[in-house]
């Protein structure tokens, strides 16, 4: 992580979700903290109830931290919050040294994918010599043309020599594999529809896109982490989860 708030957010998040220290909600989280997670009602009080309910079972292991201005993204694994461990992304916004807002996209832990990759393995260190804004521009352009516009050949144009390392549980490595997967779902009427990007977190060669869309007509949140090498896409991780309509959520902040 190369930004200002990465360690602050990681420390607070780890205290809460790995050590079960709910006192951190009073010291590191703003009194007006806004919680967008579809799993939580009641902002700070809702998080307190969730963690206290998990008791000694609560745990968190971090794999990656991305810091980008007032946003920090964490990629990791939770225990104790559900019947199975959860893997995915947390995005925090920081203001005046406090955590003021949070979004997440979490999915059950899965077995290694057809290429043997897991939801968390792979490179973790941010290369601060890479221009984060250039990385953001590349990924945003790719995302818009390829996923929102559904021109899946974009995977060929934004990669090199067909190399694309895949951590999504259902897809093997390679450009052909990801295009085939997306085209097959589309042909079955279960295609992944991307409507808009709500936010990006860019740190060196890593870029997280947090977007909204639908799968087979059902509203979903997409959190997808892209890795670039020499300006081309080389690797990705994701957490794609069904989310309720804002009017049906446990809170009135909206999911996004």
Language-model-detected regions and their locations in the chain:
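C-terminal and inter-domain tail/linker signature
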Residues: 1-256
């Amino acid at each position: 992580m190369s930004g200002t708030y990465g360690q602050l957010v990681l420390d607070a998040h780890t205290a809460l979700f790995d050590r079960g220290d709910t006192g951190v909600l009073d010291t590191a989280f703003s009194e007006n903290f806004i919680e967008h997670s579809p799993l939580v009602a009641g902002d700070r009080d809702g998080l307190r109830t969730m963690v206290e309910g998990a008791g000694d079972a609560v745990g968190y292991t971090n794999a990656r931290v991305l810091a980008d201005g007032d946003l920090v993204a964490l990629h990791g694994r939770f225990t104790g919050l559900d019947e199975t461990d959860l893997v995915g992304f947390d995005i925090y916004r920081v203001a005046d040294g406090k955590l003021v807002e949070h979004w997440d996209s979490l999915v059950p832990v899965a077995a290694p994918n057809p290429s043997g990759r897991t939801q968390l393995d792979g490179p973790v260190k941010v290369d601060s010599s890479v221009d984060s804004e250039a990385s953001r521009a590349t990924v945003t352009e790719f995302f818009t043309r390829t996923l929102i516009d559904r021109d899946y050949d974009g995977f060929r144009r934004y990669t090199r020599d067909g190399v694309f390392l895949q951590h999504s549980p259902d897809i093997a490595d390679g450009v052909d594999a990801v295009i085939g997967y997306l085209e097959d779902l589309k042909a079955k009427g279960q295609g992944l529809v991307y409507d808009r990007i709500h936010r990006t977190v860019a740190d060196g060669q890593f870029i997280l896109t947090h977007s909204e869309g639908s799968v087979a007509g059902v509203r979903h949140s997409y959190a997808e982490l892209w890795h670039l090498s020499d300006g081309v896409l080389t690797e990705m991780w994701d957490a794609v989860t069904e989310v309720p309509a804002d009017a049906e959520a446990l809170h009135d902040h909206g999911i996004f």
